[in-house]
């Protein structure tokens, strides 16, 4: 990611500030300079806030970023533009705030834009805070904490990671590399193992419960097996067949006893049943004999009923004749009454028919007028049905005339406009070839002019650079002379005995211990004199002078290096500039020609646009002409249609108005309808009346004939009755009626006789059957048989219950054995499958030779990668003296993340706190850069085209500072834009580009400047 623009509104000390990072050349190192509190770090806060809504350091609350001098009604906002993966994006984030005078919070906003190459505009991608934050995180592939480590190294953050303990490093590395997922994996596996162990223990518990509930059938051997523990699964499996065998033997034994007693019980039940049947048959035989004696006592009365029944049967034919004559006589009387009623009905119908005929004659007198009206209706019916069409024709034909006049007028006006436009177009004599010729001339002139302008600017720039180059060369010459003077001065200083500085006390001690004539312990010669011949004050003075001259010399060498770098840079720029004085002499003339040609082109373009406008208007009016002609044809066609309809209407209806015709048609139609309705009703009434007369006349004749036939039948029945009475011996109709009254009781008499004979026969047959059944058979004592049955049944039930209990116990044992075997099989399979998981869980939770958890192992891997990257720079910065290494230690928890330093001079490891301030800075910077590179690799390979460092360089000496700067310069040359915040003056001299932050105590401003 490479920033291109940052706009801060009401943000910290910036009320409205625009920082254009495109002023920085690619791969450029620049310095951010300003007084303390001017807002340098706020630039980093602005970038981080735009991307993540947070400050650049954890200790700073984003709510404190709003400017104290901001307008109470204006929000704090940041607009940040940047490039990533050859794409441009813009993020606009506005913080929520309470407007002045309001009590409610105005919510924040977030808009994310992407630059579209085709339209050359930023297009909105997200406009909600939650979705926008997700879009940014997906785009960058990192979170805020990782961004701080990758792009921004804030104040105090360098040393924090270096000197922190394992626990603190674990927290930082966990966030950067999301290693919490390994702890979650470890906990997930641990919980899975715990759950699995619980399930295994639960299964052993269920096996124990099932085993303890197994039935032993009071068998001593089985009772002994019950003492087995659920963990002894192999012994349990061996014992199960013994339980099954004992249960099977008991079940077979009780089944045999149950079968024997069941046969005995069935036999006694059959015997009791047969004895009960015999006793009941003897009793039934006695009862039937008594019933037969009682029944035969009614024999005489039955004989009398039989004699009476014979007489009743003989009178039956007479009864039928008698009833037939009575029926005919009743029918005869009814027919006479009906005949009189028919005669009255016929008289009424004839009167009604005459009345209808007179009404018909009156109605027929209107027939001629009705026919005329009916013909008119038939002839004009289609006009009445389509009356709206003809009414519309009468109304529209007048409007049509108006439209035709208007259309003719518009056609004439449009024709005049078309003629005028054609004349105007003909007056404009210009074509595209003229435009193309002038455009080509303008193009050539523009290229020539641009080239001459560039040459003119190059000349000015060359003159400026030449002046600056001469000044720089003079400074180089002067500085070299100063360096030569300093070197000469350094050579002239007396360096004899310079190494004896600070050795005065040591020499005096030696002098006090020796005497003249002694042998020298150093050279071995005889001591001739112990006088003091070394001038220690002069040696110290020379030592200080050498140091002072060396400092001045180093400073001048640095100045010379910077001046030579600047001189080379200016020289390269001068050599790249193209200069030609001959080419720029006529630039004003070319510029004037270009203006003239542009004006000519504009004039021609205006004429072409005017002609195109006239042509467009002409085409429009031609379209209008065509539409007016089409409309005229349609109006004429409609007029012809309307005239045809009107003439047809007048011809057939004899009316000039539709309303009068409609009124007349309705009146005629109503008259005809009423006539037809009345005529149909009368005709219907006449026909119905005639039909009724015919029906009643036919009924009259039928009834007369029926009366004659009934008189003959009644006379014939009377003769037959007299003959039958004479045969039977009856003298009067009274005797006949007495016998006939008894005829009603015939069925009752027959039923009494039949019932008697049926009962007598039934009793006789039953007595014979029972006599045969009980012959030679003697009943036994019921009480004795029942007692025997009770005893047998009691024994049988006892064995049935015992057998059922045994079967139930055997089946329950079988079910429990199946469950136990299922649990055992599951346990064997599960233990075999889970053994590796159990072992893996213990290894991941730290129960291993290294005593490291999975997450700690992963973090150590990342830390060693970071240290490896850091050592590449630290060895160079420390002159191959120092190298970071991870402290090796074995303990539980997050151990092994401490860092110590290996000193190649002493060939020993040292605690990190033993480093000096400058050395600590070197190690911190190297570690921070190494951390940044590893995080970059792990974050999906996001391209780091920029880095900002907010850290003091004041603790470094001259040589260390140079080494640190070389490291940062190499970062720049590797493709990164590197920005540094520092107050060290040497950096201002070494870094030519400065982003200066100035403050007037109320607000701050920024600007880029070159040294």
Swiss-Prot record:
A Pfam family matched in the record: AAA_23
Residue ranges the record marks as coiled coil: 181-210
Origin: domain of life: Bacteria
SUPFAM superfamilies assigned to the protein according to its UniProt record, in alphabetical order: P-loop containing nucleoside triphosphate hydrolases
Gene Ontology biological process: DNA recombination; DNA replication; double-strand break repair
InterPro entries registered for this protein in UniProt: P-loop_NTPase, Rad50/SbcC_AAA, SbcCD_Nuclease_C
Residues bound to ATP: 34-41
UniProt entry keywords in alphabetical sequence: ATP-binding, Coiled coil, DNA recombination, DNA replication, Endonuclease, Exonuclease, Hydrolase, Nuclease, Nucleotide-binding
GO molecular function ontology, one term from the record: endonuclease activity
Nucleotide-binding among keywords: yes
Role according to the record: SbcCD cleaves DNA hairpin structures. These structures can inhibit DNA replication and are intermediates in certain DNA recombination reactions. The complex acts as a 3'->5' double strand exonuclease that can open hairpins. It also has a 5' single-strand endonuclease activity.
NCBIfam families noted in UniProt: sbcc_Staph (NF041751)
Assembly with partners or alone: Heterodimer of SbcC and SbcD.
Name used for this protein in its record: Nuclease SbcCD subunit C
Species lineage: Bacteria, Bacillati, Bacillota, Bacilli, Bacillales
């Amino acid at each position: 990611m490479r920033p291109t623009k940052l706009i801060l509104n009401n943000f910290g000390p910036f009320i409205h500030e625009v920082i254009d990072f495109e002023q920085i050349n690619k791969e450029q190192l620049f310095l951010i300079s300003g007084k303390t509190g001017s807002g340098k770090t706020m630039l980093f806060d602005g970038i981080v806030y735009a991307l993540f809504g947070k400050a650049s350091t954890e200790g700073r609350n984003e709510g404190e970023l709003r400017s104290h001098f901001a307008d109470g009604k204006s929000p704090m906002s940041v607009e940040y533009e940047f490039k990533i993966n050859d794409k441009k994006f813009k993020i606009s984030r506005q913080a929520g705030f309470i407007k002045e005078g309001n009590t409610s919070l105005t919510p924040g906003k977030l808009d994310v834009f992407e630059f579209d190459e085709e339209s050359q505009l930023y297009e909105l991608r997200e406009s909600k805070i939650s979705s926008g934050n997700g879009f940014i995180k997906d785009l960058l592939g990192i979170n805020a904490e990782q961004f701080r480590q990758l792009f921004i190294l804030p104040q105090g953050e360098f040393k924090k990671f270096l000197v922190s303990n394992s626990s603190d490093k674990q927290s930082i590395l966990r966030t950067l590399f999301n290693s919490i997922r390994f702890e979650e994996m470890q906990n997930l596996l641990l919980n899975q193992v715990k759950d699995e162990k619980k399930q295994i223990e639960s299964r052993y518990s269920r096996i124990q419960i099932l085993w303890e509930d197994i039935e032993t059938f009071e068998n001593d051997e089985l009772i002994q097996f019950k003492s087995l523990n659920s963990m002894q699964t192999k012994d349990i499996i061996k014992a199960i067949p013994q339980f099954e065998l004992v249960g099977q033997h008991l079940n077979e034994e009780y089944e045999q006893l149950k079968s024997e007693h069941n046969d005995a019980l069935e036999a006694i039940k059959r015997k009791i049943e047969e004895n009960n049947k015999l006793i009941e048959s003897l009793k039934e035989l006695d009862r039937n004999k008594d019933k037969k004696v009682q029944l035969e006592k009614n024999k005489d009365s039955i004989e009398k009923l039989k004699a009476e029944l014979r007489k009743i049967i003989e009178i039956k034919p007479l009864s039928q004749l008698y009833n037939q004559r009575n029926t005919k006589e009743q029918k005869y009387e009814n027919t006479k009454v009906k005949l009189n009623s028919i005669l009255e009905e016929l008289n009424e119908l004839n009167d009604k028919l005459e009345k209808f005929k007179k009404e018909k004659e009156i109605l027929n007198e209107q027939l001629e007028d009705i026919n005329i009206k009916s013909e008119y209706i038939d002839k004009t019916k289609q006009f009445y049905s389509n009356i709206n069409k003809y009414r519309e024709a009468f109304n529209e034909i007048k409007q049509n005339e108006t439209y035709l006049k208007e259309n003719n007028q518009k056609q004439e006006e449009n024709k005049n406009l078309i003629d005028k436009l054609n004349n105007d177009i003909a007056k404009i004599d210009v074509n595209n070839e003229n435009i193309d010729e002038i455009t080509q001339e303008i193009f050539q002139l523009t290229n020539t002019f641009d080239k001459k302008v560039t040459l003119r600017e190059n000349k000015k720039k060359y003159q400026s650079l030449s002046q600056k180059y001469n000044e720089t060369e003079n400074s180089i010459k002067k500085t070299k002379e100063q360096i030569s003077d300093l070197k000469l001065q350094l050579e002239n200083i007396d360096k004899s005995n310079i190494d004896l500085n600070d050795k005065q006390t040591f020499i005096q001690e030696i002098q006090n211990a020796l005497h003249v004539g002694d042998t020298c312990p150093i050279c071995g010669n005889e001591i001739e004199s112990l006088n003091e011949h070394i001038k220690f004050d002069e040696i110290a003075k020379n030592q200080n002078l050498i140091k002072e001259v060396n400092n001045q010399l180093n400073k001048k060498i640095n100045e010379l290096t910077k001046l030579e770098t600047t001189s080379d840079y200016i020289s390269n720029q001068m050599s790249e500039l193209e200069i030609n004085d001959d080419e720029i002499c006529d630039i004003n003339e070319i510029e004037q020609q270009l203006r003239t040609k542009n004006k000519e082109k504009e004039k021609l373009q205006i004429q072409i646009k005017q002609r195109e406008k006239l042509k467009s208007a002409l085409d429009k009016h031609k379209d209008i002409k065509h539409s007016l002609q089409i409309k005229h044809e349609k109006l004429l066609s409609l007029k012809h249609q309307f005239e045809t309809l009107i003439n047809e209407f007048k011809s057939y209806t004899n009316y000039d108005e539709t309303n009068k015709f409609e009124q007349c048609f309705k009146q005629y139609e109503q008259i005809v309808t009423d006539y037809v309705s009345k005529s149909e009703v009368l005709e219907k009434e006449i026909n119905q009346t005639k039909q009724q007369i015919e029906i009643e006349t036919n009924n009259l004749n039928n009834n007369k004939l029926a009366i004659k036939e009934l008189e003959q039948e009644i006379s014939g029945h009377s003769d037959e009755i007299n003959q039958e009475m004479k045969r039977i011996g009856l003298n009067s109709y009274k005797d006949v009626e007495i016998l006939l009254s008894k005829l009603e009781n015939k069925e009752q008499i027959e039923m009494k006789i039949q019932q008697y004979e049926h009962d007598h026969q039934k009793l006789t047959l039953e007595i014979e059957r029972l006599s045969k059944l009980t012959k030679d058979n003697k009943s036994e004592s019921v009480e004795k048989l029942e007692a025997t049955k009770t005893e047998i049944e009691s024994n049988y039930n006892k064995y049935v219950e015992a057998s059922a209990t045994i079967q139930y116990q055997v089946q329950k044992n079988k079910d429990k054995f199946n469950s136990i075997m299922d649990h055992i099989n599951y346990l064997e399979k599960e233990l075999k499958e889970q053994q590796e998981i159990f072992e893996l869980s213990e290894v991941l939770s730290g129960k291993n030779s290294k005593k490291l958890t999975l997450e700690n192992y992963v973090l150590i891997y990342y830390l060693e990668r970071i240290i490896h990257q850091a050592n590449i720079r630290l060895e160079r910065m420390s002159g191959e003296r120092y190298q970071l290494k991870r402290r090796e230690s074995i303990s539980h928890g997050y151990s092994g993340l401490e860092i110590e330093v290996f000193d190649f001079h002493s060939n020993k490891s040292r605690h990190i706190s033993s480093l000096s301030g400058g050395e600590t800075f070197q190690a911190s910077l190297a570690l921070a850069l190494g951390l940044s590179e590893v995080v970059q690799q792990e974050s999906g390979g996001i391209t780091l085209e920029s880095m900002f460092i907010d850290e003091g360089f004041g603790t470094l000496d001259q040589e260390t500072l140079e080494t640190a700067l070389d490291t940062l310069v190499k970062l720049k040359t590797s493709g990164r834009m590197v920005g540094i915040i520092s107050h060290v003056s040497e950096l201002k001299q070494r870094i030519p580009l400065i982003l200066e932050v100035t403050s007037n105590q109320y607000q701050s401003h920024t600007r880029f400047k070159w040294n």
